[in-house]
Amino acid sequence: MAEEVGSGEVVARGVRAVEDLPAGLVYAGVSLGVLPAQRLAQTRPGARGAVLLEACLPAAAHGGWPAGLPVQVHGTAADPFFAGEGDLDAARALVAEADDGELVVHPGDRHLFTDRSLPSYDAAATALLTGRVLELLARV
């Protein structure tokens, strides 16, 4: 999709999608969906947190991580996109910058491991991810 419309358009569509929603949200994205989710978490007033799955941008992409904003990042250790394209390094730096940050690196090399419709689905990793995300949501 990003190749067809461009990553800027993906972000713009994500931002437009939440225009009429209340401010107090936790923003979540999977893979390419992390682009708008992370931007909204870092720039939309009233954000309550962020859950970034299988991708992460440097916090500086949107002016630094907001003080006190919880963030959770999940990905697999050898995912060619998450680990191989710099997202894991960006996630480590972001979590180090955040007051309330958690990076969960799951074993394996699968991308989109939470999508049960794909061969890359990993039920055990998805169960762990779900538990951690629910804990975060209960806190915010």
Question: What do these predicted regions represent?
Answer:
Residues 45-57, 70:
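A conserved short beta-strand
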Residues 73-75, 106:
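Short beta-strand/loop motif that positions the catalytic acidic residue
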